[in-house]
Design a protein with these regions (language model features):
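CN hydrolase (nitrilase-like) catalytic-core segments centered on the catalytic cysteine
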Residues: 13-16, 20-129
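Beta-strand-turn-beta hairpins that frame and shape the catalytic cleft
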Residues: 2-17
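Short, charged beta->alpha transition segments
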Residues: 1-6, 26-30
Length: 130
């Protein structure tokens, strides 16, 4: 697992956490990152595409931040999801194996630093430290 802080954003720096797919299944790790990172990246080389799609769907709400999973073109199954209303939740989704794909999209992780974001945060969520 890696956590880096970048001078991106108008008011606060952006903290990005990254892990490989196996480490992402460690719920203690994910719980620890909940208040520390603003975006979570997952690198995968995984055949079990459906399980990791479902995991990203759960993690972006649990962590209350954008979660991006990039899987190998050999297996497909890359996705980017943010905790927004249902019609805005899926930023990118690529399925199918043996293909190369590039998705370009914009994600603003600063939306989720406070409790006044577009989607209701978790119960008891007080925002991330700035």
């Amino acid at each position: 697992m890696t956590l880096i802080e970048l001078p991106i954003g108008t008011k606060w720096n952006t903290r990005i956490a990254a892990a490989i797919c196996y480490d992402t299944t460690n719920l203690d790790l994910v719980a620890d990152l909940h208040g520390r990172s603003d975006m979570f990246l997952v690198a995968a080389l995984n055949q079990d595409v459906q399980t990791f799609d479902n995991m990203v769907a759960a993690l972006h709400f649990r962590m209350y931040q954008p979660v991006l999973l990039t899987n190998s073109g050999e297996f497909g199954g890359s996705t980017a999801q943010v905790p927004l209303p249902k019609h805005e939740r899926l930023s990118a989704h690529v399925h199918g194996n043996q293909q190369d794909a590039v998705s370009v999209f914009e994600v603003d992780p600063s939306l989720f630093k406070s409790i006044s974001a577009a989607k209701a945060p978790l119960a008891g969520y007080k925002g991330r430290p700035r």
